[in-house]
Amino acid sequence: MQEYTLRTEHATVVAIDQHARSVALAAVDLATGETRGTRLADCPTAARIAGWAESWATGPIRFVYESGPCGFQLCRDLRALGHACDMIAVSSIPRSADDRALKDDRRDARGLLEAVTSPTSRCRAVYVPSEEAEGARDAVRAYFDQVRATKALKMQTSGMPLGHGHVWNERTPAGKLRAAWTRDYVDWAGSVRLREGSPQGTLKACLEATVSAIDGCGELRKGLLELCLEPRWKPYVDALTRLKGVDDVVALSFAVTVDDFSRFPNGRSVSRYFGLTPGRRDSGERVGRNGRITKAGDTTVRRAVIEGLASLPSHTGARKRGRKGREVSAAVEAEAAKCNDRNRRRYRGLVDAGKKANVAKTAVASELVRQMWAIGLVVAREQAAGR
């Protein structure tokens, strides 16, 4: 989103502050400087928005709007009508104190218009994925959201018997503590009698909600594993799972989020996209000091990749075994083996140098997403060549 591009390719820019049932529009004619604005209610369509601009604007029109819960559909619809349209990352739009204190739809639209047409604009356009990729990504995010919600339910529910003096201490014949949240555990928790004055029905309701959530996680995961076998994603999942610490769900999460592997110019841009590059805290004479990772971008993939590296301390130099029906090319196999060896040595070197285990894992995760991108590029080229 550069000012030069706007002025050389488009005569009019229209900023949209989008809501579910209404939009506020602010527009400027780049040749004359004339500005206009309006508000459209009753769930306006892309055709209605474009019609307002076309009724007075001259030359090519570029539409822009903030990223938000309304998603990519407006952008797709406006592009289908033949107009240029970008969704702008809301994190890249500058906000003044006045903008935060005095907020309304028309002011937001004017602020976005000023931001994207400024000669020093640093606004970034969001990548618009294919509808297939967006649907798969929504399924992935729903699964991880359900996993986190289920974890919270488990902690809440298992804490109720414990708080009343009941401890799960069933053990195997070998003396090992049996796992919680098995059928035996649920039966045991259901048989617990709380102290007088505590509603027994609360524990029962929490148990039912937790068991239902666990079942929901299983169903969602099953759906993701079926997606992994779809022709669109299977080559990428098969290739990415050759990397240690990357299972089917992590591989699918990465593939559906990236969608088009060629959109990244280099590996560092991939790490930056997933918030795995260190921040900077330079000021005055304090220069060259890196801070914590930025945690910008897609949280789901970043968390999945880091959690997938939990087994990193136990990685050996042995190759990861392939599965029947999940064969990959020799180029992918060789690249994955090289990456696995590098990650193992990188982790061990950082730990031996005194870095904390989680810091070392995060550093490896930053390299791992680059490696996944590089392998994805190989697969994309093979698919294009009709391997």
Regions found by a protein language model. Name each.
Residues 32-59:
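Nucleic-acid-processing active sites and adjacent nucleic-acid-binding tracks
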Residues 7-29, 112:
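Gly/Thr-rich phosphate-binding beta-strand-loop-beta motif of the actin/hexokinase/Hsp70
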Residues 239-242, 248-353, 386:
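Phosphate-backbone recognition surface of nucleic-acid-processing proteins
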Residues 141-239:
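Glycine-rich, often acidic, oxyanion-interacting loops/wings at catalytic, nucleic-acid
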Residues 113-141, 180-197:
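A short, charged helix-loop
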Residues 86-125, 175, 180, 287-296:
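Short alpha-helix plus adjacent loop in nuclease-associated cores
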